[in-house]
Amino acid sequence: MIKLITWEMDRSHAPADPAERIKLTMKHCELVKKGMDSGKTKMWGMNPGGNHGFSITDGDEKEIFAMIAQYIPHVKFKVESMLSIDEVIATLKAMMKQG
């Protein structure tokens, strides 16, 4: 099942020094790229302000926890299960047969 992960930077844990912030952001970007290259992360995006974004994965709960734990405490996450269009149609068809 597809999972939508929305995230928001927690600036209270960001380094005060701009050079250190850039270094931390680069580390996070490298982790994202690693997830994309491995296929675990299907899609990722960040707003132009750099403070929030999204990720899409089909990993299970344990894989997702292992992935997002790398960013804590600098990033806050919300994870939601999503249905594909095929899953929605199949569910609706099953409901139609019952009723």
Predicted features along the sequence, with ranges:
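Conserved, structured core segments of small domains
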Residues: M1-G99
